């Protein structure tokens, strides 16, 4: 790649976003299968972004459970989105099938009380429905985050779950990612050079 410009043009490849998105999704799927998981439930912002190539809005950051994604077997990711943000995802992220964008059943991590238990039941029922749709309901679900409400509801629903954070951490740097890191380093490097 001869040019690292950030603006897309029709006469240079520059950053191939499709290739990066495909790489990340397939890499997550590969790691999921290597760990004998039928599905991955991703609740941390960085993992949701890695698999879905969507951005977590500021008010959802660092709050696992407000927005999450489910990767089942060889299927496209299912994104459970906050409110009507899903409408914007449908418009701006055509790589996620429209039928795979759902409303999230959200609670803030570690919440207590009857309302949080009601929400986590809806949350779990929605996960099981998607896992059945992709024929992985009898397989182990990898999770990158779990709280006491999820733990209790997963046990009640007879969901076999395991560590999903470790597979997500096992990544290598594709050449495209190296290019992006070089681009993001350029402005501060220029600043220090001028000092």
Residue ranges and their predicted role:
Residues 1-191:
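A composition/biophysics-driven feature that prefers long, compositionally simple stretches
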Residues 193-195:
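Extended, charge-rich low-complexity interaction segments
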